[in-house]
């Protein structure tokens, strides 16, 4: 594993990321969140009062959640001011109410929340235990959790194959970012070990398609 910078602050990188079409993956994340918010009986559970999106970036997940749950408080947190500005502009354009905060995981102070999500955050972290500790700390009783991220291939040849398959015609900055992110990502086994150390026994790890993993479940 080769870690990459924790924050995306370079203007060219921020603009390229914000302009990229991640709608397919974003929708899969939103669909999983919707399913997670249903009770065991299949009936829709009550809407979460407070939703926390960690590493929210330009709002790809936060903004649809704010639209889907207009009575909920949606809090988007990111350490990059440039990313948050994109999210603010989009929220204004869409007329959405959302609480956007610039903070690192280390400095984040919040009251307990009812739903914690992140999309492509984990691989940025040099200390992944921060995410799991914060998840446990901020989870209200019965909090639902969903973290979706890339998973690291076993060999560099597989990194190249995935790049050719999924972003062969992307801008150079996105190709570089995609490859660096794959190499920086964790394996499902590593994430399972992280969850065990954090005492998050109610969360499970599963693989999604050819390059993602999903951590989800309930925190009692």
Please report, for each region that a protein language model flagged, where it lies by residue.
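N-terminal, positively charged/glycine-rich alpha-helical extensions of SAM-dependent methyltransferases
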Residues: 1-16
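Conserved beta-strand signature within the Rossmann-like core of class I S-adenosyl-L-methionine
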Residues: 142-149
């Amino acid at each position: 594993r080769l870690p990459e910078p924790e924050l995306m602050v370079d203007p060219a990188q921020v603009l390229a990321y914000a302009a990229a079409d991640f709608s397919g993956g974003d929708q899969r994340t939103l669909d999983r969140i919707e399913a997670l918010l249903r009770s065991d009986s299949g009936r829709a559970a009550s809407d979460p009062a407070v939703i926390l999106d960690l590493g929210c970036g330009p709002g790809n997940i936060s903004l649809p959640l704010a639209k889907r749950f207009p009575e909920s408080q949606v809090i988007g947190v990111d350490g990059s001011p440039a990313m948050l500005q994109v999210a603010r502009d989009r929220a204004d354009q869409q007329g959405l109410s959302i609480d956007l905060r610039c903070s690192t995981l280390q400095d984040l102070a919040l009251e307990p929340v009812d739903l914690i999500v992140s999309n492509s955050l984990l691989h940025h972290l040099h200390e992944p235990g921060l995410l799991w500790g914060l998840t446990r700390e901020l989870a209200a009783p019965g909090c639902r959790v969903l973290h979706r991220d890339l998973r690291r291939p076993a060999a560099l040849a597989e990194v190249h194959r995935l790049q050719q398959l999924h972003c062969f015609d992307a801008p150079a900055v996105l190709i570089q970012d995609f490859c660096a992110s794959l190499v920086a990502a964790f394996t499902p086994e590593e994430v399972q070990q992280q969850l065990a150390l954090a005492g998050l026994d109610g969360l499970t790890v599963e693989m999604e398609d050819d390059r993602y993993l999903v951590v989800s479940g309930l925190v009692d």
